[in-house]
Amino acid sequence: MLLSKAQYDEIALFITTLRPTRQCMRRLKERFPCQSQSTLLSIFSQEYQKLIKRTHAKHHTPEAIEMYYARYLNEVARDPTVPILLELANEVDFSPALIARTVLERFLQDHDGQPPTKPILSSMLRDPSLIPDPVLANQVHLCIINDCCNGPLVDGIKHAIGHEHEVLLRQKLKEHNLAFLDEDQLRLKGYDKTPDVILEVPVAVDGHVIHWIESKASFGDEASHNTYLHDQFWSYWNRFGPGLVIYWYGFIEELDCNRERGILLKDGFPESLVTLGSCMAQNAEHGQHTKSRLSETHQETQS
């Protein structure tokens, strides 16, 4: 699904009025019924990540951490059944999963007498039953399952969706009888930074020859696309030549401006692509047709 910059900006502006809850997607879909839910969810997630980056520092000052932890202790002493951390996250307009991580880290520092290691903290967020306090474990669990943009649950879903679309890409290539090397095969050959697939024989898409394809199970906005260009796409271009990027959930159409330089954008697997074999067949057919016409013309001239 392609959006103009103006359409994208309208969606992004509306997202600033929403909080990262499961209900926000219903409001977003009601406001933009013509857009697919997967596209809207991808845009929402990316816009919310930008907000998190902008406000992350103020929620992690020593003063903020102590305030959140004290608030949790006071509220839980009053009524441990209330979703305190979830309500706190909504109140300060920050990610529930990240608020839970902050309070859990502070709790473990009190409990163990020293800050927890990152692996321990991450394992407890993935499996709150490992948290030594059952009340806090439940509070963290509520934050994790109610955060639609951050946390181990969301990370797992994103990873699964990304893998699913990589599998879809490989299936499409096989359906078109296109030989390719995937990331695992390329790493065995010693490549460290590679696209998802490299075509063993280049193909033409919209009149442009491509050597590789990168799958992105996300929406291509300006910020993410420019980051990918800098960190990935131009590196692929330098090493392997021109290629194709598939943003499965759409992109801002104005970003597809590097075709002549060798990077094409699509929002799905190309409907029409031209292989070297089909080119040769077409050329042979054209040559045979031309030869026949010349022969006919010669015979007409002789008669």
UniProtKB/Swiss-Prot annotation:
<comment type="function">
    <text>May play a role in erythroid cell differentiation.</text>
</comment>
<keyword id="KW-0539">Nucleus</keyword>
<dbReference type="InterPro" id="IPR029404">
    <property type="entry name" value="CDIN1"/>
</dbReference>
<dbReference type="GO" id="GO:0005634">
    <property type="term" value="C:nucleus"/>
</dbReference>
<dbReference type="Pfam" id="PF14811">
    <property type="entry name" value="TPD"/>
</dbReference>
<keyword id="KW-0963">Cytoplasm</keyword>
<dbReference type="GO" id="GO:0005737">
    <property type="term" value="C:cytoplasm"/>
</dbReference>
<protein>
    <recommendedName>
        <fullName>CDAN1-interacting nuclease 1</fullName>
    </recommendedName>
</protein>
